[in-house]
Amino acid sequence: MRALLIIAGLALFLVVCNASQVNEQSSLNEVLSAIFAVEEPQERDDCLGLFSSCNPDNDKCCEGRKCNRRDKWCKLKLW
């Protein structure tokens, strides 16, 4: 009887430890997702995001980007 009680206690302990580890892992995944989430800043709804096809004569790229005349797509404006 004592051995059965010890085995049941160990099984319960393993279940609790596993549940807390799964919860901790999901929390870690949420934090990492938030850190590495790439969101393009868009001031206007009609602006073009990074690497979008554009017209250099009518530059509609979002703030911080400029339509490249050679490639005709929005690139980061470095200066």
From Swiss-Prot:
Residues 20-45 form a propeptide. It is found in: Secreted. Expressed by the venom gland. GO terms for molecular function: ion channel inhibitor activity; toxin activity. Pfam families: Toxin_12. Keywords: Disulfide bond, Ion channel impairing toxin, Knottin, Secreted, Signal, Toxin. Residues 1-19 form the signal peptide. It comes from the Eukaryota. InterPro entries: Huwentoxin-1 (IPR011696), Huwentoxin_CS1 (IPR013140). PROSITE patterns: HWTX_1 (PS60021). Disulfide bonds join C47-C62, C54-C67, C61-C74. One of its GO terms (cellular component) is extracellular region. Belongs to the neurotoxin 10 (Hwtx-1) family. 34 (Jztx-26) subfamily. The presence of a 'disulfide through disulfide knot' structurally defines this protein as a knottin. Probable ion channel inhibitor. This is U16-theraphotoxin-Cg1b. The lineage of its organism: Eukaryota, Metazoa, Ecdysozoa, Arthropoda, Chelicerata.
